[in-house]
Amino acid sequence: ALQALAHPPVTLGTANGLSLSGQELSLALASSGSTGAPKQISITRKQMEASAKGTGSFFKTDPNSKLLCCLNPAYIAGKMMLVRAMVWNCEIHLVEPSSNPLSKVNGDFDFVAMVPLQVQASLEDEKILQKLKSIKHLIIGGAPISSKLKANLVENGIKAWQTFGMTETVSHIALAEIGKEELLYQVLPGVD
């Protein structure tokens, strides 16, 4: 079930470029350019489903899980939040991407993906910090996490994971728990 906050409801289907109804579905996406000039790549339904299943297996999600999508669905990170909700058959809440997306929501979430800027802004507001602490599984990606941000997460007792991935790998393929001295990445189930 999709629930939209702060904007009109979103219906998943071909009109907005994402549907899991066809076996031959593929999306043309632009890579980020982190490994060279941005290029168009094609990602299939099968790849998106495999990524969502690997993440779900890693975090042991179930249909009772409650997700928050606070990333732009025009990019792989936001798209994959929608795919995860469909594959995991769970509730997802959508908020317009901003530096402090938790200021726009109430309630607790089981799975949230954020970029470091969003996490840093959440740490700086005491009310929002409590919401951040209540997230069961927080993944952080899209940019490097500074040592200061890592220290703030540990100091505040926030369990979070740094991701390793890119558009070409259909989101993350490995995760490292933040809080250990050295980040040790664990490859997702099903990734060779």
Question: How does the language model describe each region?
Answer:
Residues 39, 65, 136:
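Nucleotide donor/acceptor-binding cores
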Residues 31-34, 67, 82, 112, ...:
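Conserved S/T- and glycine-rich ATP-binding loop of Class I adenylate-forming
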Residues 126-181:
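Gly/Ser/Thr-rich phosphate-binding loop
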Residues 25-53, 60:
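Conserved AMP-binding A3 loop
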Residues 1-12, 39-42, 91-97:
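Short beta-strand->loop structural element characteristic of the AMP-binding/adenylate-forming
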Residues 57-62, 128-131:
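Glycine-rich helix-loop-beta junction characteristic of Rossmann-like nucleotide cofactor-binding loops
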Residues 12-30, 62-66:
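Conserved pre-ATP/AMP-binding loop-to-beta segment of ANL
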Residues 43-50, 66-121:
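AMP-binding/adenylate-forming
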